A protein has these predicted regions:
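Short hydrophobic clusters on alpha-helical segments that form packing/core surfaces
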Residues: 21-29, 71, 75, 98, ...
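Hydrophobic alpha-helical bundle segments that form small-molecule/ligand-binding pockets
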Residues: 119, 132-159, 174-180, 202-208, ...
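N-terminal intrinsically disordered/low-complexity leader segments
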Residues: 1-16, 176, 206-222
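Helix-turn-helix
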Residues: 2, 16, 20, 24, ...
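Alpha-helical DNA-contacting segments of helix-turn-helix folds
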Residues: 63-71, 112
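Hydrophobic alpha-helical connector segments
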Residues: 80-108, 156-163, 208-218
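Amphipathic alpha-helical segments used for helix-helix packing
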Residues: 103-121, 172-178
Length: 222
C-alpha cells in the first residue's frame, strides 16, 4: 500500500514537472520561435542541470511533440459537437471554429501548421484528429444533401478541401500580416460564401469516371 502511494506521488510529481517544462518551452517558442528553444535554456529556466531535463524529455523534438499534442487537444476542444438549426451554418461551423483557433491560439496554430522547423513534431495524433474531424464534417455535408441544399452527387472530399482552404489561407494571412493590406476576416467570409454558391450550383460534383489519358494520334507519334 505504501509502495503504491509512493509510486503515485512520484508519478504525479513527474507529470507536474513535465507540464511546467512545456509551459516554459511554450513561452520561449511564443517569444522567439523554434530556434530559440533549447533543452539547455529550458533547463536553466526550470532551475535544472542541463542533464536533468532529459529525464522528462529525451530530446527537443519529443518536447515539441508534446507541445503539438497540447495544441491538438485545444483544437479538438474547439471543434463543435453541437448541431445548428440552419444546415449551412451547421456545415460551416467547424471551419469557422478552426479559423477562430488561429486567432485565439496563434502560437499553437503556427506550431501545428506553419512552422517548417517544427514539422517533425507532428505525426499520428495529428492525422487521427484530422480523421475524426473529417467524419464529423461528412455528416454535416450529408445533412445539406438530405435537405436538398446540395446535389446528391456533390464530391464531399473536394468540397471539404475547398472549405478548409477558404479558412486556412486567411488564417495564415492574419498571422503573418502578409499581404499587409488584406483583411482576413472579410476574405474568409467571402471565400466561404463563394464555396457554398459553387456547391449549390453543382460545380463540385463527383466525376462520372476517371479522366482518360490523352494520347497523340498515331501519325503524330515519333
Amino acid at each position: 500500500m505504501l509502495r503504491e502511494r509512493v509510486a503515485a506521488a512520484e508519478g504525479s510529481y513527474y507529470d507536474r514537472t513535465r507540464r511546467k517544462i512545456l509551459k516554459v518551452a511554450h513561452k520561449l517558442y511564443t517569444v522567439a520561435g523554434y530556434a530559440s528553444v533549447s533543452m539547455r535554456e529550458v533547463a536553466k529556466k526550470m532551475g535544472f542541470s542541463a542533464q536533468a531535463i532529459y529525464y522528462y524529455f529525451p530530446s527537443k523534438e519529443a518536447m515539441f511533440a508534446a507541445l503539438a499534442d497540447e495544441g491538438l487537444r485545444l483544437l479538438e476542444a474547439q471543434h463543435p459537437s453541437e448541431e445548428l438549426a440552419d444546415p449551412i451554418d451547421n456545415l460551416l461551423l467547424p471551419y469557422v471554429r478552426y479559423y477562430d483557433f488561429s486567432k485565439s491560439h496563434p502560437e499553437y496554430f503556427t506550431l501545428l501548421w506553419m512552422d517548417p522547423a517544427a514539422a517533425t513534431s507532428q505525426g499520428e495524433p495529428q492525422i487521427a484528429l484530422i480523421a475524426r474531424m473529417a467524419v464529423d464534417v461528412q455528416g454535416r455535408f450529408r445533412r445539406c444533401i438530405r435537405e436538398g441544399l446540395f446535389p446528391a452527387d456533390i464530391d464531399i472530399d473536394r468540397a471539404g478541401s475547398m472549405l478548409f482552404s477558404a479558412v486556412h489561407g486567411p488564417a495564415v494571412i492574419g498571422l503573418t500580416g502578409r499581404p499587409p493590406q488584406d483583411q482576413p476576416d472579410i476574405i474568409v467570409r467571402l471565400l466561404l460564401d463563394a464555396a457554398i454558391l459553387a456547391f449549390r450550383s453543382g460545380l463540385v460534383r463527383k466525376a462520372a469516371e476517371s479522366p482518360k489519358q490523352l494520347t497523340a494520334p498515331a501519325a503524330a507519334r515519333p
